[in-house]
Amino acid sequence: MPLLTLYLLLFWLSGYSIVTQITGPTTVNGLERGSLTVQCVYRSGWETYLKWWCRGAIWRDCKILVKTSGSEQEVKRDRVSIKDNQKNRTFTVTMEDLMKTDADTYWCGIEKTGNDLGVTVQVTIDPAPVTQEETSSSPTLTGHHLDNRHKLLKLSVLLPLIFTILLLLLVAASLLAWRMMKYQQKAAGMSPEQVLQPLEGDLCYADLTLQLAGTSPQKATTKLSSAQVDQVEVEYVTMASLPKEDISYASLTLGAEDQEPTYCNMGHLSSHLPGRGPEEPTEYSTISRP
């Protein structure tokens, strides 16, 4: 019985020392994506001891997140930092970039031989308020998305139309080229007679020298002079147009001066190709009265 009372007394004294040697806020609130600061105060005599910040509702199972180095230099680990102000006997814990999962029970503690000193701090995280920029960003994104869809719809309509127009132009150009080629082939396939065919209405008139039958060319010249005196009528021959390289001659012979003149229409078309040599024979035609 006296031994049990002694244990209870020691436990009460130990708990009293824990509570009175270090103090801190009971509850601390923070905003999501924000930060919070916790200040813990300790009594004189603990300035050079190590201070720590741990997480967990159970004292023995809490996980130390950050610890001082025994000086006033700030120590940071991940999103948590701690700094000891030994003159004011306070150490400050800062948690940054808060998340909803950071809400839990934490401890402000002092490391010492035997049981450490500590006090609990309840941390709660409130949702961050929705700003006006975030609210207006959704319609902007929606409008931008709709604008992109509208542009894509226009392209889906215009591209087939442009392709169809280009295809029609290509077909039209092909037909035009085919017809021109066919026309050239048809023109190249014309016969020489068609190429050399004279135009209608193109008449050639030639003055023909009249010779009497049975006379030589010299006598014919003399007789022609006398015939001119007697106003002998001159015969005319209508001839079709001939190529320049084809030369035709016509000779007319009269039996007597009192005989009536004879008229003859002569036409000669060359069936030979253009460009024949000058050595080709000359054609002559003689017309006599019966």
Curated annotation (Swiss-Prot):
Keyword Transmembrane appears in the UniProt entry: yes
Chain segments annotated as transmembrane: 157-177
Recorded name of the encoding gene: CD300LF
Family assignment from sequence similarity: Belongs to the CD300 family.
Keywords assigned: Cell membrane, Disulfide bond, Glycoprotein, Immunity, Immunoglobulin domain, Lipid-binding, Membrane, Phosphoprotein, Receptor, Signal, Transmembrane, Transmembrane helix
Residue spans, topological domain Cytoplasmic: 178-290
Membrane topology annotation: Single-pass type I membrane protein
Cited PANTHER family: CMRF35-LIKE MOLECULE 1 (PTHR11860:SF101), POLYMERIC-IMMUNOGLOBULIN RECEPTOR (PTHR11860)
Name assigned to this protein: CMRF35-like molecule 1
InterPro entries reported for this sequence: CD300_family_receptors (IPR050671), Ig-like_dom (IPR007110), Ig-like_dom_sf (IPR036179), Ig-like_fold (IPR013783), Ig_sub (IPR003599), Ig_V-set (IPR013106)
Described function: Acts as an inhibitory receptor for myeloid cells and mast cells. Positively regulates the phagocytosis of apoptotic cells (efferocytosis) via phosphatidylserine (PS) recognition; recognizes and binds PS as a ligand which is expressed on the surface of apoptotic cells. Plays an important role in the maintenance of immune homeostasis, by promoting macrophage-mediated efferocytosis and by inhibiting dendritic cell-mediated efferocytosis. Negatively regulates Fc epsilon receptor-dependent mast cell activation and allergic responses via binding to ceramide and sphingomyelin which act as ligands.
Signal sequence segment: 1-19
Membrane side Extracellular: residue ranges: 20-156
Gene3D superfamilies in alphabetical order: Immunoglobulins
BP terms from Gene Ontology: immune response-activating signaling pathway; interleukin-13-mediated signaling pathway; negative regulation of apoptotic cell clearance; negative regulation of mast cell activation; negative regulation of MyD88-dependent toll-like receptor signaling pathway; positive regulation of apoptotic cell clearance; positive regulation of interleukin-4-mediated signaling pathway; TRIF-dependent toll-like receptor signaling pathway
Listed GO MF terms: ceramide binding; identical protein binding; interleukin-4 receptor binding; phosphatidylserine binding; transmembrane signaling receptor activity
Domain named Ig-like V-type: residues: 20-126
Result when mutating residue 284 to F: Interaction with PTPN6
Keyword Transmembrane helix listed: yes
